[in-house]
Structures are given as structure tokens and as C-alpha cells.
Amino acid sequence: MFCIQCEQTIRTPAGNGCSYSQGMCGKLAATSDLQDLLIYMLQGVSVYAVKARELGIIDAEIDSFVPKAFFATLTNVNFDDERIMAYTQQAAHYRAQLKASYEAACEQAGIAVEQVPQVAQLVLGTSKIEMLAQAPIALLNKDKHDVHEDIMGLRLLCLYGLKGAAAYMEHARVLGQTDADVAGRFHEIMSFLGEPSVDGDKLFTTAMDIGQLNYRIMAMLDAGETQAFGHPEPTVVNTKPFKGKAILVSGHDMKDLELILEQTVGKGINVFTHGEMLPALAYPAFKKYPHLVGNYGSAWQNQQQEFANFPGAVVMTSNCIIDPNVGSYSDRIFTRSIVGWPGVVHIEGDDFSAVIDKALALEGFIYDEIPHTITIGFAHNALMAAAPAVVENVKSGAIKHFFLVGGCDGDKADRSYFTELAKSTPKDSIILTLGCGKYKFNKLEFGDINGIPRLLDVGQCNDAYSAIQLAIALAEVFECDINELPLSLVLSWFEQKAIVVLLTLLSLGVKNIRTGPTPPAFLTANLAKILEEKFGLRNTTTVEADLKTMLNVA
């Protein structure tokens, strides 16, 4: 086992990364090894997808499968060995299918079949024991003694960034958004990473390419969400329980939320969002469901307590899931899509009757709690509508600075930095937030500036796209570069979606970003220095020192 993809990975003087019997996330060594083998097989599929494309062969089913299965290897997504093995076997099937199509096309065209790299040649074992025996060939640091640590760090930066992009591709696909060109570029990068490179410049360029690719993917996802559900609008949301039977929907998948709402109409069940599903409450399409009553709980890391206290059924539509046995609710949590946990019921297809039956059998909330409301829904359409007023207040001096504070949340004590930063921002500044990092301060009162709320909740982590659109619009109005705006970005990171959002921002030329609470363990000190020199990327220090620098720089 070797896994170093998330913020909570083991860090020791002897080396970084989880490499024992179990990762810090709870992932067993066998599961980690099977996930590495899955990635290896997916890279082999991409090798043939690239070659097949050169001869005009495009398989949309395979284009959709590869990022979806890759998504299963993200932090806190799928811990079920049987499901991981099934994805791996399917990858082997698709690779063979593409290989046959490619070779047939070569024969028809009268050209030679090209030699493929080792990553596309593995004959997959048929049992778990055989697959685990093959796993060392797929170990991410298998050649660590032969390559410079900076090269290893760049490889991992690319791999983990591409994982994040794969997740957003799958979210977009669920909403009907696919793009053959995007899929083709995705395969090219997967294929490239399947042949471990020692070219630092090429790896760095690839990392920026992944960022650019993800910008296109975020635009696809934004189009999918707004076409399906309308543009988010400023919305007041209750965060306290309502009396009655209940279902809690967590993750990111709004299509699943829609299906659950449709299937619970008239059944006397209240539906609550959780975590990154909170932004759904701002979409017009969901406001026609009166039994979508509000948001319950906070960010993913608190779920073992929050789900244990929730007296209804819980649905995990995507990341992040952690051990449901700790809170003794494994019999009433359900997984969807790429999510998996051993022994937890997985919902295939679009029938949520098992979830509904479980909710009806449980007690539900026995009384209403005193409401506490927050305001959400400031995605790019709402931000653009407010832009003239924002510009006027900037010109008058009423608004002097913008802060984007958000990203992933986590359970480390030093993440209190983000709470203190938000509370310490000047009264003449605006705070934009997104992702589950918002839960560090989104229930606090920040007031307004001439009717413009000081705290603007932009949405999910992928809604960094909305924040980018606002920054571009403001830069155009003020006829300046984005980096010349009175704008400071402070991103909390935990997993691979945050990595690819960072790569996206860097690829767009956004500079002077701060990340925290700790730097990725796979980034060497030298790589961190290069990123600081090239982009001004730096780690958070103290609220007082960082605020002083940010406000002075602006």
C-alpha cells in the first residue's frame, strides 16, 4: 500500500504517505492496492482509446466509463473491494474491445499495429488473490528509488489532479453533458501517466493542461446543472430539523436528489440536504417540492455524529463517506453511483423505494426545532446580476476588497484558521465561499454593504467556475488583469477535487493563492518553492500575518 492523495495522510520524518495495513481514511491496504490496479487497467484502456481515436474509432460508453471508475479511487468514495474488482474487470473487457477494434482498423487500413506500453498489456487475474498479487506493478511509487522525488511529486500532482477532473466529468455526464474532445484529451493524459515520465517540464505542462481541461469540464457541469434545474438564486435556507419522517441526501449529485424528491411526493417524508448538497436548495427546479425542507448538519467529517443523530434514512450520492459502523447507522445509509462501503446497501438504477421504506419505518424527528436560517445561491448568474451594484460600491470605496475563502473541510484543529480569517476580514470587504469549507463560518452573521451581503455562498466546490466568471467580469469592467483586482484567494484543501480546482486557477494565470491548512504531502519542498516563484502560491500562516499581506498587496 502507498497512498498520499489526501490532506490527512501520514507524515513522518522517515517519509510521507499511508503505507501500512490501513490508511488514515480507513481504507485497508488491500483496497488501496486494488484501487491502484484499477487505475493501471484504466490507463491501459486509455492507451487503446487514444490509438483507436487516431483511426476514427470513438466509443462513448468507454469514454464515460473510464472517468467514472477513476472517480471510485478518490478519497472517501469507495471502500468496497468487490465493487473495485468489478470496475477493474470491466476495464479489462473494454481494453480488449478497443484493442480488437484498433487492430481490425489497422488491418483494414493496411497499416502496422503499433506496440503498446506495458500498462496496456497486463493479463488481469481472475480472483482477488491473483489481483492483489498483481498490484505491485501498479504501485504509484514503485520506482521511488530510481527517480528524483520532484519527479515523483509531479507525477502524483498530475494523477491526483486528473482524478478530480474525472469526478467532475462524471457529475457532468449524469446531467447529460459529454464532450468527445474532452474525453479524448482525458484519455491522452491518462495514457501519458500510464508510462511513468521522468521529464519534469513535460509533467509540469501536463499539470497545467489538466487545469485547462478541468475548466472546460466545470463549464460543462455548470451548463448541466443550470439547464436541468435553472440558475441558482439567493435563497433563505433553514438549518434546523422539522418534525416528521426524514431522508438526508449527501454528496454532490443533484439528479439523485431530484429522483428522491419525485418519489417521495405525498408520502409524508421530509427531505434534507447535507454537506455539498446544500446549494441544491437555491435551484428553482427544487423549490416546487415543499417537502425539501432545509439543510441538516455540516461538512463530511462530522457525519458519524450527524448521521447517527439523524432519525431517518441517509443517501450518499458521491464523496465523502466514512465508516458508518462507528455511529451504528450502517443499516439505514445507502450508497449510489461510484460510492461503496462493505455491507451497506447500494442503490442501482433509479428506484429509491428501499430508502423510502426505511425512512417510513424509522421514527423521524419528533418535534420542530427553532429555525436558524442562512442565505445561499450566489452562483454566477446571481453574481452577474449584482455586478453593477458591486462595481458602484467598489468605485465609491464602500467595498475595498474581496476574499474567496472555501474549498474542502476537514477535522484538523488548525482548520479553525478559516473561521478566524472570515471573522477577521474588514467590514468593507466581501467574502465569497464555496465547497464544504464554507461550514467553518457560514452560520455566522457578517452583515451587508449597502444591501449586498458580505458573505456570498457561491455553491459547491465545482462552482469555483462561478467565482472565476465574476473575477473575469470585474477585471473587464475595471480594465485590469485578474491579479490586479482587490481579490485574495484562500483555499482549504483535503482531496483531489481541490487539487484540480487549484490547477485550474493556476492554469488560468491566477496568482498569489494561499492554501491550507498544510501543503500536500506529495509536493516536495523544491516543488513548493517553484510554485511559489512562478505563481505566488503559498501556504497559510497566521490570520493576522496573512491578512496584513493580502490587504497590502491589493
UniProtKB/Swiss-Prot annotation:
Instruction: From the Swiss-Prot or TrEMBL record, state where the protein is found.
Output: Cytoplasm
Residues binding hybrid [4Fe-2O-2S] cluster are H252, E276, C320, C408, C436, C461, E495, K497
- Database matches in Pfam families: Prismane
- Keywords on this record? 2Fe-2S, Cytoplasm, Iron, Iron-sulfur, Metal-binding, Oxidoreductase
Gene for this chain: hcp
Can you tell me which family this protein belongs to?
Belongs to the HCP family.
Q: Which GO terms describe its cellular component?
A: cytoplasm
Enzyme superclass (EC): oxidoreductase
Family matches, as CDD domains: HCP
Coiled coil regions, renumbered to chain: none
GO MF terms here are: 2 iron, 2 sulfur cluster binding; hydroxylamine reductase activity; metal ion binding; peroxidase activity
Tell me the lineage of the source organism: Bacteria, Pseudomonadati, Pseudomonadota, Gammaproteobacteria, Alteromonadales
Name the reaction it catalyses: A + NH4(+) + H2O = hydroxylamine + AH2 + H(+)
Task performed by this protein: Catalyzes the reduction of hydroxylamine to form NH(3) and H(2)O.
Q: Which cofactor does it need?
A: [2Fe-2S] cluster; hybrid [4Fe-2O-2S] cluster
Quote the record's binding site residues for [2Fe-2S] cluster.
C3, C6, C18, C25
Enzyme Commission identifier(s): 1.7.99.1
According to the record, cofactor stoichiometry and binding are noted as:
Binds 1 [2Fe-2S] cluster. Binds 1 hybrid [4Fe-2O-2S] cluster.
Q: Protein name, please?
A: Hydroxylamine reductase
Identify the main location. cytoplasm
